[in-house]
């Protein structure tokens, strides 16, 4: 088995960082191309939006279990196989004229990305420790957040210059190059292989999901992420078909949306010592005000320049709420931090996909007003689940005090 050579350690680390945002790139890069795909494949907008959902659901479910596979069979061989599968499936999508073939390949890509990303996160745990490990892991969220910023920007230009298939050629070429570099400079990072045990994993997951405050926090962050997905699924059709702007403009809009989400996360870190209940209550109140104002404004005038400011404000607050409660979920089970991370990331993808696609399917989002209605529905659900979360958290804290 090929192991990482000491002189290639730095290159392996750079390659690992390069693959962490792959899940975001695999969805966000072709968001500006959704209208073109629907037209070329002669299918409805919801049919091409389903390609996003299938990818995220397969990636989310896979994240729940691939950690144990990687611990049992190693990171390197599974990672190389996943990169090869992703590259080939990207080529098939680009060449395919069938939406059903694209569906199948997106599921393959979701599973592949789960193996790649989880394996690369584990690489850092295998190779580093102490302050070095802390420094590297602190960069994960920042690097992951680059995808919704950079990918739509690239995708908009690819769509305008070469068409929708070029996005998948780009993804395939990217993973092919990284895969070849992995073959030359990479290697197995796992020191000790573990036997694969399925039943104990399920038991731990069941125990976590029975913890009410954890599960409710997980639902809330899924609703926050669903806001970004709803915008990603619908904004290209509004911007390109209703406002008559180019795919490049749709790409820039998604870029700004990603920046707003990142700023919200940064603000949350600066307020880490503030009361969780107070700051989330204020944040949800602001989101309600922004969503209602977005709907009212659309009754008088609607354009790209009236829609995007409201979107950015809502997404900034969503990033704030998301970061606070995502941290809460990860810290809720300190003794099983790895499993908590897997279940939080995996189920968040699955639930956010169902929330967003279900809402897009029920609400015909073809205007600023209807996008505002979709946001209002999501914020109202966040408010309801946060009230339930507050009560569950208070009950759990009271129980701990009574036992002590």
Where are these regions (language model features)?
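Cytoplasmic helix-loop-helix junction between adjacent transmembrane helices
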Residues: 105-146
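Helix-loop-helix hairpin linking two adjacent transmembrane segments in secondary transporters
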Residues: 101, 138-183, 252
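A late C-terminal transmembrane helix in Major Facilitator Superfamily
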Residues: 326-365, 374-375
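Paired small-residue
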Residues: 85, 89-92, 100-108, 305-313
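C-terminal membrane-cytosol helix-exit motif in multi-pass small-molecule transporters
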Residues: 173-192, 386-389
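Conserved MFS/SLC helix-loop-helix module at the cytosolic interface between two early adjacent transmembrane helices
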Residues: 61-99
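Juxtamembrane intracellular "pre-TM" segments in multi-pass secondary transporters
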Residues: 2-6, 187-218
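Helix-breaking motifs and short loop linkers at transmembrane-helix boundaries and internal kinks
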Residues: 42, 74, 95-101, 112, ...
């Amino acid at each position: 088995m090929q192991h990482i050579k000491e002189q290639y350690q730095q290159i392996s680390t750079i390659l690992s960082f390069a693959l962490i945002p792959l899940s975001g790139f695999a969805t966000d890069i072709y968001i500006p191309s959704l209208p073109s795909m629907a037209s070329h494949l002669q299918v409805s907008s919801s049919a091409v939006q389903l390609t996003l959902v299938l990818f995220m659901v397969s990636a989310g479910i896979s994240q729940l279990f691939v950690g144990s596979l990687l611990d049992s069979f190693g990171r390197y061989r599974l990672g190389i196989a996943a990169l090869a599968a992703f590259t080939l499936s990207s080529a098939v999508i680009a060449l395919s004229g069938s939406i059903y073939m694209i569906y199948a390949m997106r599921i393959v890509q979701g599973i592949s990305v789960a193996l790649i990303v989880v394996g690369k996160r584990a690489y850092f745990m295998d190779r580093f420790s102490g302050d070095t490990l802390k420094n590297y892991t602190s960069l994960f969220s920042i690097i992951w957040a680059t995808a919704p910023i950079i990918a739509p920007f690239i995708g908009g230009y690819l769509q305008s210059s070469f068409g929708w298939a070029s996005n998948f050629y780009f993804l395939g070429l990217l993973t092919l190059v990284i895969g070849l570099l992995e073959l030359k400079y990479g290697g197995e990072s796992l020191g000790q292989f573990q036997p694969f045990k399925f039943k104990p994993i399920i038991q731990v997951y069941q125990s976590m999901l029975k913890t009410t405050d954890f599960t409710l926090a997980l639902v809330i962050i899924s609703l926050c992420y669903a806001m970004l997905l709803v915008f990603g699924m619908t904004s290209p059709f509004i911007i390109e078909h209703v406002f008559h702007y180019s795919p490049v403009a749709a790409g820039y809009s998604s870029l700004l949306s990603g920046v707003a989400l990142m700023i919200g996360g940064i603000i949350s870190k600066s307020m880490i010592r503030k009361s969780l209940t107070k700051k989330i209550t204020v944040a949800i109140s602001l989101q309600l005000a922004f969503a209602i104002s977005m709907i009212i404004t659309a009754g008088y005038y609607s354009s790209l320049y009236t829609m995007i400011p409201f979107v950015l404000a809502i997404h900034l607050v969503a990033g704030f709420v998301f970061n606070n409660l995502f941290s809460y979920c990860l810290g809720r089970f300190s003794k099983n931090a790895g499993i908590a991370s897997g279940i939080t990331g995996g189920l968040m993808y699955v639930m956010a996909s169902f929330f967003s696609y279900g809402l897009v399917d029920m609400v015909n989002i073809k205007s600023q007003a209807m996008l505002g209605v979709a946001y209002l529905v999501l914020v109202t659900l966040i408010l309801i689940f946060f009230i339930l979360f507050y009560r569950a958290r208070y009950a759990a804290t009271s129980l701990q005090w009574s036992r002590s």
